[in-house]
Amino acid sequence: MAISKDDILEAVGNLTVLELNDLVKAFEEKFGVSAAAMAAPAAGGAAGGAAAEEQTEFTVVLADFGANKVGVIKAVREITGLGLKEAKDLVDAAPKPLKEGVSKADAEAAKKKLEEAGAKAEIK
């Protein structure tokens, strides 16, 4: 019996974020492709103007969970909204990006919460 596109979409729609991440990695390995977004071509005209722009989107990276793993898992759940298992898997896989494309204030708040729980976090 052949699997339809609708069946595949339904199955993918029921996956957790971590399961989707594993699926993407499996696709990358099996087919030798990258899931990275293609960069848009640079617009000509404003020479050097782009270099002076201030970064507006930041990524919070969990570098290390430190000695208080349980507290860090709780903080990760609070920041990301992940379930217990997904948050534990993310903490165990450190260093890992925790939140991507967030404002500077949100990134700093997440970093502060992680550090208060005993983790080492970075903003990139």
UniProtKB/Swiss-Prot annotation:
Keywords: Ribonucleoprotein, Ribosomal protein. Gene3D superfamilies: 3.30.1390.10, Single helix bin (1.20.5.710). One of its GO terms (biological process) is translation. InterPro entries: Ribosomal_bL12 (IPR000206), Ribosomal_bL12_C (IPR013823), Ribosomal_bL12_C/ClpS-like (IPR014719), Ribosomal_bL12_oligo (IPR008932), Ribosomal_bL12_oligo_N_sf (IPR036235). One of its GO terms (cellular component) is cytosolic large ribosomal subunit. The keyword Ribonucleoprotein applies. Pfam families: Ribosomal_L12 (PF00542), Ribosomal_L12_N (PF16320). The keyword Lipid metabolism does not apply. It comes from the Bacteria. GO terms for molecular function: mRNA binding; structural constituent of ribosome. Forms part of the ribosomal stalk which helps the ribosome interact with GTP-bound translation factors. Is thus essential for accurate translation. Homodimer. Part of the ribosomal stalk of the 50S ribosomal subunit. Forms a multimeric L10(L12)X complex, where L10 forms an elongated spine to which 2 to 4 L12 dimers bind in a sequential fashion. Binds GTP-bound translation factors. Belongs to the bacterial ribosomal protein bL12 family. This is Large ribosomal subunit protein bL12.
